[in-house]
């Protein structure tokens, strides 16, 4: 019927955000799967691409920082607008994008305050940059997947990354010099 998504701080001491997701239209819930997505960080391109969500992307922060070839092709094909940085948002582009959800980031556990400027737009805040371990950052794919009902796919991708990481880590066990 619905899902509750909790976003914890990396030390798991604090709940930073709580999202309620539902496949039905319900007050106070984010309807999933999301149909129109915008991103205020080019870092999220890796998660978007890995989950195959390019077709849902309707706006990005700054095109010059997107390295993903598949996303760049979608940007050109659809003449996707640039939103700019969180500090200097192109308000017209943000409103014209008509995104159902905007991926953004919070600073040190707090939001950027952008949701107060746009109370009718739904923001989902990621804190992957606070992770100190590579697998912690990789695991954020599960967060991005929840809004598209792609949790099983995200779990599979993460487990593959985890296995590869652990195999590579095992190869370096006997390495004496570690820069």
List the model feature ranges, each with a label:
Residues 1-5, 19-21, 57, 120-122, ...:
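Generic preference for hydrophobic/aromatic residues in regular secondary structure cores
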Residues 1-18, 111-118:
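Extreme N-terminal leader/targeting regions
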Residues 9-23, 27-108:
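A short, structured surface patch at a secondary-structure boundary
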Residues 36, 92, 96-105, 109-179:
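Extracytoplasmic substrate-binding proteins
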């Amino acid at each position: 019927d619905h899902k509750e998504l909790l976003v914890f701080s990396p030390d798991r001491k604090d709940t930073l955000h709580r999202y309620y997701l539902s496949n039905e239209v319900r007050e106070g819930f984010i309807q999933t799967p999301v149909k129109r997505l915008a991103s205020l960080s080019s870092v999220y391109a890796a998660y978007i691409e890995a989950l195959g969500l390019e077709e849902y992307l309707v706006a990005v922060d700054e095109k010059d920082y997107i390295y993903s070839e598949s996303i760049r092709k979608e940007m050109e094909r659809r003449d996707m607008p640039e939103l700019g940085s969180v500090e200097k948002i192109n308000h017209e582009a943000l409103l014209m994008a008509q995104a159902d959800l905007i991926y953004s980031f919070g600073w040190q556990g707090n939001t950027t305050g952008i949701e107060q400027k746009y109370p009718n737009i739904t923001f989902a805040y990621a804190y992957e940059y606070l992770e100190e371990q590579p697998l912690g950052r990789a695991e954020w794919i599960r967060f991005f997947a929840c809004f598209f009902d792609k949790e099983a796919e995200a779990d599979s991708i993460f487990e593959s990354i985890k296995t590869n990481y652990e195999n590579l880590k095992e190869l370096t066990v006997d390495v004496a010099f570690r820069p």
